[in-house]
Amino acid sequence: MSWLSNIDKKQLALHVFFICLVGVVSAFTSIVLCICVNTSYRLNQEYSWLVFLLPVLGIATLAFYKAMKLSYFYSTDDMVMEMRENKPVSPTLAPAILVGTCLSTLGGGAVGKESSAFQMGASIGETLSRAFKLKNVFKNKQDRNVYGYAALMGMSATFSALFFAPLGAVFLVFELTHFKTFSPARFIALLVSAFIAASIAYPFGIGDIIPRVAIPGVTPDLMLQVVLIGTLGGILGRFFGASLAAVRAWERKRLNHPYLSVLVVGIGITILVVAFGLQSFEGGGMNLLKQAASGSIGTWDFAIKAGLVFLALGSGFKGGEIMPTLVIGGLLGCSLGQLIDVDPAFATAIGVMTFFAGMTRCPIAAFFLGFEVFGVEIIPFLAVSLIFAYGASHDSGYYGKGIRLNFHSARRRQRLAKQFIENAGGVDSALAKLEEQANEFATEKEQAARKEARGGAQASDPTAKPPNDAASHS
């Protein structure tokens, strides 16, 4: 077959070895990250006075980023934007985010490690691809770089090693990049690498294993309650993500002294934690998620956690936002469950995924991640809640715009068409205006083609004089 002859066998062998190597390296990367961050968290909880060092540790983190020649403001959302544009990722990002996350956690910053694993995975995946001199498997496409492919593989593998959810990890990285680099072959490659990473990491007992919950039977009343939790989770998740993104965008444009921001906010976080006894809200928050599953939380605990996460990540402390997002969603779901008489553990599970979908604008990844974490029994509830979570929230979150599903696109087209007709003064006027614009476009296209033809003629005969338009029209 012709497509077989187009395959570069050497590159194919390199790709197979690369897939396995990324899986292995990503697994041990996640293991190292977990050991370091978990140690920092244990020290913070054992020696509560470390919270007073949070401002100093934040400044030290920014100094380390400067030494690594990275932007003070660089975070996961910046990396996602680079992935969407197929730009390379700095190899120094892996050690920088590892050190930054550990220092933030040591001082009591409300940050996680999953997004840090994303950044480390992207950096490692791309660095390995350069060492392999990796190119496209197909000979006629070897002029295209593979930065995005290699980085996505590292991202999905490291995330899978933390959550032991290969499908959710792969769909998350593709969804974050709007499926721009998606192909069946790449999907399989990323999935194999993610499975390898999860299989290696699992026996070590690392990662954040969200406890499974009992899933009730499907009833009309329960479905309505799930719709309510999903809708509110999506709306509040989107609001949280967009607010955090807006603050970070403002900092990039307006903030000239990032050290001052970390110092002032770090002092503020320290005062809040000490004054109100919020030590349990420090770090990623897995302890809070376990409490939510048992129903032993306060009604407004989700708001407290969201506030501390917003202050830490919004001011420039380094760390992940994914685990805190899941925790906030779980706390919100548990609170809503208590209000509407739904099992707290089940409500926590629905809240986790719907808030995550609203914040990231990744409903497909939330669906697969949800049933991998909570089991296939949750699928009908998950599907319904995520549809309402995505539909109720605006098409923008922490990572910018999400994928455009049909109902979003159709609704936007309908709104634009209605506005166009109203501005034109009716359907007939709108059609006439469209015809006029089409004629203008055709004329402009014809003039551009004529100009290009003249340019080509002059290029082929430099001595030729440009034609006289007036003479040609006479």
Show where each model-derived region lies.
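Alpha-helical transmembrane segments and immediately membrane-proximal extracytoplasmic
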Residues: 1-474
